[in-house]
Each structure stands twice: as C-alpha cells, then as structure tokens.
Design a protein with these regions (language model features):
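N-terminal hydrophobic targeting/anchoring segments and the immediately downstream early-domain regions
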Residues: 4-150
Length: 150
C-alpha cells in the first residue's frame, strides 16, 4: 500500500485450507462461512489485504477419511455454495482469462486445488470429474503413502 492506502500490487496465494476447515467445523455442528470467520482467511481479510487470487485446497487426511474421494466431492459442493453466496465479491476461475475478467470486474478469483492424491487415485474418471469442477492444481501425496507415491 502507498501512503494513501491504495493497493499497489495484488497478491496471488497458491494455498489455503479454509474450505477444508469450514467443512470440518460444519461436520462438528459449528457455524463457519467463507465471507467472515475466525480462521486464517476469509473474504473480508482477502479484500483488505489486496488479494487478486486465492487458491483453495481441498485437503482430505487419508489416515482419517473412510472415502477420500467422496469427502473431497462434498468439499467441492461446499466450495461452490460459498462462492455462489458471495458471487458479488469472488468468482471461480478455470483459465487465466477468467482471472483477467475478475480483475476487470473488481472481483477476487478463486482457484480450486486438491491436496492428497488419494482423492483421485482409484479412478481416472474421478480426476476428470475434479478437473471439470475447476481443480487445476493437485498434489500426489501428503503424509501418507498412496498408489501414486510415497
């Protein structure tokens, strides 16, 4: 920011666990929203901080989840619902052109990523499904061995 408080450069952050954290809180019966919450990141904080793009990782702990793919698909649904509720502020991006369009409109960009290959290790069709939902980044492993790596 300059002396007048104007943002000179937009930030593009390539990882946060906010959607996964909101998902877990809701599983515990607690209220949590993307717009404003007590987590590390919410839309209000992104706007104040001068963000242009936030990558939202869907994290599933293979050591705890019964079905990693199903769990991640539920998180995709949550991600889409939260974006719809806040569509005046943030939109999902699939291409660089989408990022440019959001910037022209004064909106934040949301990029979807997958953290843990066990989400899609069972079937190439699952990986295709997540791609169709907008996932553009994926990690093959986290802390557990899976069929993709160790």
């Amino acid at each position: 920011m300059d002396k007048q408080g104007d943002i000179l450069m937009k930030f593009y952050d390539l990882h946060c666990d906010t959607i996964s954290a909101i998902y877990e809180l809701r599983k515990q019966g607690k209220q949590a929203e993307l717009s404003k919450n007590s987590l590390h990141l919410d839309l209000e904080k992104l706007q104040r901080g001068g963000y242009g793009l936030q990558t939202f990782a869907l994290f599933v702990d293979k050591g705890e989840a019964e079905d990693c793919c199903l769990e991640a698909k539920s998180m995709v649904q949550l991600f889409k619902e939260e974006l719809k509720k806040n569509q005046d502020v943030i939109s999902q991006v699939f291409t660089f052109g989408d990022i440019e369009e959001n910037e022209r409109r004064g909106k934040l960009s949301a990029l979807l990523s997958l953290e843990e290959g066990s989400i899609f290790e069972k079937s190439p069709e699952d990986l295709k499904w997540f791609y169709d939902q907008g996932a553009r980044i994926a990690t093959f492993t986290w802390n557990h061995e899976n069929s993709l790596g160790y």
